[in-house]
């Protein structure tokens, strides 16, 4: 079963028809759109600022999404694939990437 944890009173929100691998970790202020896949070993850590993921996004094995301490939001648009072991740290990615 995936690690989905509330942090600082905020629980992740996961859209419809999403696949979340059993050892993926989704923590804190994370919103995932519809029809997404979060693969094995991926970590989405919305501990100090939010992470917003659009629809039809593929976060592949071992990827890490994390925010910076100074007012950064990680935003991933619609129809995006973050490749194996990708690191998205305090950055935004537009649609169709």
Locate the predicted segments by residue:
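A structural motif detector for beta-strand N-caps
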Residues: 12, 17-20, 24, 30, ...
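Terminal amphipathic alpha-helical/low-complexity segments used for targeting or macromolecular assembly
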Residues: 1-17
